[in-house]
Swiss-Prot record:
Belongs to the STPG1 family. GO terms for cellular component: cytoplasm; female pronucleus; germinal vesicle; male pronucleus. This is O(6)-methylguanine-induced apoptosis 2. GO terms for molecular function: chromatin binding; histone binding. It is found in: Cytoplasm; Nucleus. PANTHER family: PROTEIN STPG4. The lineage of its organism: Eukaryota, Metazoa, Chordata, Craniata, Vertebrata. It comes from Danio rerio. InterPro entries: SHIPPO-rpt. Keywords: Apoptosis, Cytoplasm, Nucleus, Repeat. The gene is stpg1. STPGR repeats lie at residues 49-82, 91-103, 132-163, 173-192, 213-233, 254-266, 294-305.
């Protein structure tokens, strides 16, 4: 049901999918003797009081929390690692460079404090073989090297399209404040019932200006004005050319009495009984205008005895 560990070393085991109920840690106070001394130098006892850093407000970015099952815990928990703990970095670490002595920490307990073990001061400083900056002089970005620590389920058909659009120099058009968009293209017109045979004729037509006199302009009892004409002399006269003729003015518009007005005041027709399929054709023949128009049979077309190219409206020059 539980786990057993020995020693003070921190145990970083794999988190099982079904965690155990408790964990047993055995601490031994054994330590190695140094310099023939039997006194204990380090006394560390594990207690339940919170240590330094326990009350930090922020939590680590990568949390390792076991999953608790609804049916409880069991002794056959899986020990397979869900998230890999170690990441392989392709970039050189801090120990790959040769640091200067001045950059090392002065308070090093591995060195003696006596003057016997110190190096002499009058020494020629060695020039570094590589003048590149040290690891503590710049910040290395591991975004392109490290793998993603939060491994989650990924779809096989994951989109590879970038979310941040790269604006190129080709799209250098005017901004929205440089032009005005017509509301007709944006807003929708109210939908109403419209007939498919809707008339497009304007109901109110524009007034037409004409010089035709209106009603009441003429006076039928007033005699017409005499026409002015040039009277040529009847005798001979000396002149190099004919006398000038004054051009006639534009004839006036027709007045009342110029047209044959039809009398529409005919006797009223009385309704008589008739058949259901009475013909609506008028029996009275109207006066046909243009009596001088020749009727059928007026012409006598002559038949040509010989073929002539002059009478060839179809322009067919090949004999049939």
């Amino acid at each position: 049901m539980g786990k057993l560990h020995r020693g003070l070393a921190e145990f970083n085991g794999c988190a099982s999918s079904i965690p155990p109920k408790y964990q047993t840690v055995i601490i031994s106070n054994e330590e190695k003797k140094g310099f023939s001394s039997q006194s204990r130098r380090f006394e560390e006892y594990l207690n339940e009081s919170p240590g330094p850093g326990s009350y930090l407000s922020h939590s680590p970015a990568e949390g390792c929390s076991p999953s608790f099952s609804k049916r409880g815990t069991g002794s056959f928990a899986s020990k397979g690692g869900r998230v890999p703990r170690s990441f392989q970095r392709l970039s050189p670490g801090p120990d790959a460079y040769n640091l200067q002595m001045s950059l090392l920490h002065k308070h090093d307990f591995n060195r003696g404090e006596s003057r016997i073990f110190r190096l002499p001061y009058a020494l020629k400083k060695e020039k570094p073989n590589n003048e590149n900056p040290a690891p503590n002089q710049y910040d290395v970005s591991y975004r392109a090297v490290d793998k993603n620590s939060t491994i989650s389920g990924e779809s096989a058909f994951r989109s590879k399209t970038r979310r941040s659009a790269v604006v190129s120099d080709k799209f250098k058009g005017p901004s929205p404040c440089h032009y005005k968009v017509s509301d007709v293209l944006v807003q929708k017109s109210p939908q109403a019932l419209v007939s498919c045979f809707k008339s497009k004729t304007a109901r109110i037509q524009s007034p037409v200006r004409n010089n035709i006199p209106g009603p009441g302009t003429y006076n039928p009892h007033q005699p017409p004005e005499p026409v002015k004409r040039t009277v040529l002399p009847r005798r001979y006269y000396l002149g190099l050319s004919a006398p000038p003729l004054i051009p006639e003015k534009v004839p006036p518009f027709p007045g009342p009495g110029h047209y044959d007005i039809v009398n529409y005041n005919r006797p009223v027709k009385h309704m008589v009984s008739s058949a259901a399929f009475l013909s609506g054709t008028n029996r009275h023949m109207q006066e046909v205008k243009g009596q001088d128009i020749p009727g059928p049979g007026f012409y006598e077309p002559t038949v040509l005895s010989k073929t002539s190219f002059l009478y060839n409206p179809a322009k067919l020059w090949i004999p049939a």
